[in-house]
Regions:
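Conserved class I S-adenosyl-L-methionine
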Residues: 85-94
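Conserved alpha-helix/loop element of class I SAM-dependent methyltransferases that forms part
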Residues: 65-85
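A short SAM/SAH-binding and catalytic strip from SAM-dependent methyltransferases
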Residues: 151-171
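Conserved beta-strand signature within the Rossmann-like core of class I S-adenosyl-L-methionine
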Residues: 188-195
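Conserved SAM-binding strand-loop segment of SAM-dependent methyltransferases
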Residues: 128-138
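A short glycine-rich, Lys/Arg-flanked "PGG" loop and its adjoining helix->strand segment in the class I
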Residues: 168-187
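A short acidic, Gly/Pro-enriched loop at the edge of an enzyme's catalytic core
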Residues: 142-152
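Conserved SAM-binding loop of SAM-dependent methyltransferases across substrates and taxa
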Residues: 95-105
Length: 232
């Protein structure tokens, strides 16, 4: 690519934002080695070896270091490594990689997910990350979690799919869900979603994008960020 085209591309808002986040990660680093030193190395090795030849899609998570590196970036992008202690709720927490890093940075953490993959339960125990077992469903509120949160996050989850059809929630389902999440946020709390793409490659319909924006979100491709809470 010619230099002029590279410069032009970097001046595009999306490219600039993503480049700035990468630069911030390199400046404000989060070492993983001290965190890894706190967990049972023999247990890590045993889990990895046991799933090494598994053909199950989830078996990839038994090799924990790539997923810790990915979730370190998520923590850095939300600036949780530069924040005073917060209460963090992660929806669809899986094996707890994101919350493990957040907890090691001094935050109080809680995950919500269904109990359908034994590996995830093993990893949560390894990381000492607490989880509430709960299936998130359309038009159903979350349970009483005993506290309100400064942050509610969700990364690459599938709770907004109807099963088994895989049909995605529409604006009515999402609006109910956002209204319910507001009940679990402290005043001024933040919500971040990292969405999976549709089969078309888009992340949401135009109507859903408009809903997110109307409720106060900054929308950047898969990133839906309610930095100042929700507007109803």
């Amino acid at each position: 690519m010619k230099l002029s085209r590279k410069i032009l591309k970097f001046t595009e808002p999306l490219t600039y934002r993503r480049g700035w986040r990468r630069a911030q990660r390199s400046i404000f680093r989060v070492p993983l080695r001290p965190m890894l030193a706190k967990i049972d190395e023999a247990r890590v090795r045993e889990i990895r070896q046991r799933y090494a030849n598994s053909t199950a899609g989830y078996a990839k998570y038994a090799n924990i270091e790539p997923w810790l590196r990915l979730n370190r970036e998520r923590v850095q992008d939300l600036k949780l490594h530069r924040s005073e202690p917060k209460r963090v709720l992660d929806l669809g927490c899986g094996g707890g990689f994101f919350l493990f890093i957040a907890r090691n940075l001094g935050h109080s953490v809680l995950g919500v997910d269904i109990e359908h993959v034994a590996l995830f339960t093993e990893l949560l125990e390894l990381f000492r990350v607490p989880r509430v077992v709960w299936r998130i469903s359309a038009f159903e509120p979350l349970p009483d979690l005993g506290q309100k949160f400064d942050w509610i996050t969700a990364f690459s989850t599938n709770f907004y799919l109807y099963h088994p059809t895989k049909e995605r929630w529409g604006t009515a389902e999402w609006d109910f869900f956002l209204g319910d999440l507001q009940q679990h946020l402290v005043p001024g709390g933040k919500i971040f979603f990292g969405l999976n793409p549709l089969y078309s490659g888009d992340y949401y319909t135009p109507e859903l994008r408009d809903l997110f924006i109307s409720r106060g979100a900054d929308v950047e491709r898969e990133r839906i960020f309610f930095e100042n809470g929700l507007s109803f």
